[in-house]
Amino acid sequence: MEKLRSNNGGKNIIADQLKALRNQCGLSQRDLAGKLQLAGLNFDKNIITRIETSNRFVNDFELKSLSNYFGVSYSYLLDGIPTSEDLEKYPDLLPL
């Protein structure tokens, strides 16, 4: 059975949100991968690149890990609409 795809044919729906968060933190893809690895998560630069270009599926554990690392809601990562708590931490987040 083929896996579902996003409306634009991508393999995930968090690509734009992950890139926006990473950029707001002033991190390169390599920097983010290193920080996630230090937190005990199995991410490398290529994984970050593939997620941000919608060329990789993201599982629930990875979604939770990214949400926890950045301190944002699942709904922001999934829907691109920041909650008031997300905006307190990242005031420049715009709905994507």
Give residue ranges: language-model regions.
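Short basic helix-loop element that most often maps to the first helix and adjoining turn
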Residues: D16-Q37, P91
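Short, charged recognition helix plus adjacent turn
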Residues: E2-N8, N68, L78-L96
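Recognition helix of helix-turn-helix/homeodomain-like DNA-binding domains
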Residues: Q37-V58
